[in-house]
A protein has these predicted regions:
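N-terminal beta1-alpha1-beta2 submodule of the flavodoxin-like/Rossmannoid cofactor-binding fold
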Residues: 2-112, 160, 171-315, 376-426, ...
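Mobile beta-alpha loop/short-helix "lid" or hinge segments that flank ligand
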Residues: 48-53, 146-175, 253-258, 349-378
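Arg/Gly-rich low-complexity intrinsically disordered repeat tracts
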Residues: 432-434
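Short, glycine-/small-residue-rich phosphate/pyrophosphate-handling segment
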Residues: 114-162, 320-365
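Gly/Ser/Thr-rich helix-start
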Residues: 24, 86, 92, 130-131, ...
Length: 443
């Protein structure tokens, strides 16, 4: 893998943060760091302090856990992209890693962790044992930060052979003697891909003076058409994207998505939008999905629509995506239905980028980091706060989609809400953290 040379001011900054007790996660983290460095990133390879294992375990892996500097919340602030690597314990992240994540709360409260791109890796004793749950748990923290989450590369044949986990890399515990070259190569590729996406994250200098391009960002808003409340929120989401100069397609998934041509809503109101098709997703740079929540899950017609898309790489691959919901009660799917949609989006290769807490509108509407939500128990139509939140979600979809796309069209006019520090300030910070990755000094 050849290195990509960049000016230091434009090099993406990647932090690979790991917890390892048997060496498996350490080896994957080193490989991910090598991959990111080869893509021109400045890399920090950092460990989480382990104060949990018993004496025998301490002796076993004390050596491997002292060769890299200890991660701090400031490393999350420094990074444009993060690889989070933890073993699976009881279907969740390890306790030391969870303590590290919790330690970022003060920076999160100041709005300093938004708009990073995050991916994750894990390992377990057996083929299942909670690997998926661990990766998804890590991503919930990332969404609270306001990050974009990058799952597995569904176009990489090596990933399919290594774990076939759409949420990230998950492997079996292995001793150094049993190390799988395929696992290591896949981790290296995941680090390289993370660096490529980290290079597209916003910094003040590039958002304040965008370069001219050929045309506006494209946003498709797809909603379940049965209920007026969902339709109104979809219209507001589309309006938010248009405010930033995006081209928008507002599309519906009728109740009974497999009916040819689709059935129109039977409720009163303006005419329904055109039926959604695969081409509407292929056209878009970003997609927002809206649905009723039924029994804590997204409505079956929307799930049906998504499940008819090609498995693996398809029209959502590498595109920004998020969702909003309407629920019967405040806690009858306002989070679980959104997370379920996110899980579906990973299977399509999307970059899942919900609002998080990147704008006051999210707090005013109830503080749901996973997407906008309205409970029908609060009124038949969305509240002003819910409308403002979903309008902002449309704006955010346009901006993130604009940053992620590879084609040259005009960027949206307004930056993502949230504070990003001057990237030049951190370049001289803690120079003792320099590590050597793949024969190159990276910090």
């Amino acid at each position: 893998m050849t290195s990509t040379r960049r000016h230091p001011a434009t090099m993406p900054r990647v932090a690979v943060i790991y917890h390892s007790r048997r060496g498996t996660m350490l080896r994957l983290a080193v490989a991910a760091a090598e991959g990111a460095a080869a893509r021109g990133a400045r890399v920090r390879l950092l460990r989480v302090v382990d104060d949990g294992p018993g004496p025998s375990q301490r002796r076993r892996h004390a050596a491997v856990d002292t060769e890299h500097s200890v991660a701090s919340p400031e490393d999350v602030r420094w990074a444009d992209g993060l690889v989070l690597a933890t073993p699976t314990y009881f279907g969740n992240v390890s306790a030391p890693f969870k303590r590290f994540l919790d330690s970022t709360a003060r920076l999160w409260a100041r709005g300093l962790l938004a708009d990073r791109v995050v991916t994750a890796m894990t390992s377990a004793e057996c083929d299942y044992g909670g690997r998926e749950a661990t990766l998804l748990s890590l991503y919930q923290t990332a969404w609270h930060w306001g990050s974009w989450v990058l799952g597995a590369d569904l176009t990489d044949p090596g990933h399919a052979r290594a774990s076939s986990n759409p949420y990230g890399l998950s492997v079996n515990y292995r001793s150094e003697e049993q190390e799988s070259a395929l696992d290591v190569d896949t981790a290296r590729a995941q680090g390289a891909r993370l660096a490529e996406f980290a290079a597209r994250t916003p910094r003040p200098r590039c958002l304040s003076s965008p370069r001219p391009m050929r045309g506006p960002a494209r946003v498709t808003v797809v909603h379940h058409a049965l209920h007026d409340t969902v339709r109104v929120m979809a219209q507001e989401c589309a309006a938010g994207a248009r405010e930033l100069g995006a081209e928008v397609r507002l599309r519906r998934v009728p109740d009974g998505a497999t009916v040819p041509g689709g059935a129109r809503s039977t409720v009163k109101g303006p005419p329904s939008a055109l039926p959604a098709t695969k081409r509407d997703l292929e056209w878009a740079d970003a997609v927002v999905f809206g649905s009723l929540a039924r029994l804590g899950a997204p409505a079956a017609p929307l799930v049906d629509f998504l499940q008819q898309l090609p498995e693996g790489a398809g029209p959502l691959t590498d595109k920004a995506a998020s969702s909003f919901v309407v629920t019967p009660q405040p806690h009858a799917g306002s989070e679980s239905a959104l997370l379920a949609i996110h899980h579906l989006l990973f299977h399509g290769g999307a970059v899942v980028a919900p609002p998080g807490y990147t704008d006051p509108a999210s707090f005013a509407a109830g503080g749901n980091p996973y997407g906008s939500a309205h409970a029908l128990s609060h009124g038949a139509l969305p509240s002003p706060a819910a409308l403002e939140a979903v309008r902002y979600q449309g704006q955010r979809a346009a901006v993130v989609g604009d940053l992620l796309r590879r084609t040259d069209r005009a960027p949206c006019r307004l930056p993502v809400s949230g504070t990003r520090e001057d990237p030049h300030i951190e370049h001289t910070r803690r120079t003792d953290r320099t590590h050597h990755i793949a024969g190159k000094a990276t910090s």
